[in-house]
Curated annotation (Swiss-Prot):
InterPro entries in the cross-refs: SRP1_TIP1, Yeast_SRP1/TIP1_CWP
A GO BP annotation: fungal-type cell wall organization
Entry annotated with the keyword Signal: yes
Stated name of the protein: Seripauperin-17
UniProt GO molecular function: structural constituent of cell wall
Keywords: Signal
Amino acid sequence: MVKLTSIAAGVAAIAAGVAAAPATTTLSPSDERVNLVELGVYVSDIRAHLAEYYMFQAAHPTETYPVEIAEAVFNYGDFTTMLTGIPADQVTRVITGVPWYSTRLRPAISSALSADGIYTAVPN
C-alpha cells in the first residue's frame, strides 16, 4: 500500500520539475546562441577525447580550426566568451567534420540544446 505522504512527495517533485523546466525558444540553427551551445559541447568533447582529436588531425593535416576553439580547449576557465563571433558555417564545418559527429556529438548537442530550452528550425 502506498502512503499518502509518498504520493504527495511525488506530486511535489513533479510540480517542481515542471516549474524548473526552462522556457522554450525556437531559433535558427545558425543563431549564435545555438552555435555557442554546439561549441560548448564540442570543446567538452575535445577535452574528454583529446587523443582521438589529435589522431584525426594527424590524419587530416589540412583540416583547420578557428584559433578560438584551441584556446577554449586549453583554457579551463569560462571559455564561452572566447567562442563568440565564429561564423555559423565554420561551426557547422568543424563539428560535423569528425567521424563521431553522428554517434557522439549530435546526441550531446541535442541534449544540451533541449536542456537550455532551445529548439532549432530552419526559417521559411
